[in-house]
Amino acid sequence: MMLRRSTLALAASALLATGPLALTTPAPAAAAAAATTALPHRVLFDNSKGETAGNADWIISTAQPDPRTQNANPTTEKSWTGALSAWGVALQKTGQYSLKTLPAGSTIGYGTGAALDLANFDTFVIPEPNIRFSAAEKSAIIRFVQNGGGLFLISDHDRSDRNNDGWDSPAIINDLFTNNGVNNNDPFGFSVDVKNISTDNPRAVNDAADPVLHGPFGTVTGSILRSGTTFTLKPADNPEVKGIVYRTGSSGNTGAFFVTSGYGTGRVAAWGDSSPADDGTGQSGNNLFNGWDDPAGTNAALALNATAWLSKG
């Protein structure tokens, strides 16, 4: 993706360098050419790791892999079925994103040639995984980021094992960081705290230049925490790590609720609770709550700005 965009940029530079000859090109034709070569940000949401186990419904749509087969022109979160549908619909409505879901029973791969291989996407969203990644999958995820991909991780609280297989999201994510076969020393510079924090309204740091806090979808002032956890930063392992939203009374390397980092040529974001992304809609039988629009936080802006940043938009 980066290569193709760079190619377009070089072509544009060559056009400008032709001087007066460039004036002979009709402006409408140039605009039409630019429109046809615009490339959408490709985002893959994971559903291969028990994201709908128990009372969870962390999908953008039940139509998988392509949510547009449920509704090609969604207007609200109810256009698609899933507790993350508001997130997906907001991206879809911009016309700048191409969304897919990795269905249950699938394997996460990188460089396999499969249609849903990570190499075909700019950003991979893993919302509260409940099944441990295999050794090959952990390697694939790390290499994806290392080579320019964006990874969005959402954890939940300690003992949030929804499918009773002995693994919850904090343990699964920490295992990814320390047992991936590529870099086993916290490659992204943070770890998930093994905690169950009942409630808080974490606040954003004061950083006018941060692209996630001040992005294309609005300004982030804070988030909500409703049975979740936090992260410990380890800048000695990766100096690019940064906490941008913190639990009340916390700062520095402890108590970070939303974290960003870089690794290789890729980017990473992590959120300490699934509640802020929950839009309160989804499949029947799930007890869901609308954290997406909770006035105690600016959760929609946080999720969407982070997605844009990870996709290098």
PLM region descriptions:
Residues 1-11:
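Bacterial N-terminal signal peptides that target proteins for export
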Residues 17-36:
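C-terminal region of N-terminal signal peptides and the immediate post-cleavage residues
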Residues 34-313:
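Short, surface-exposed patches at the edges or C-terminal ends of soluble domains, predominantly
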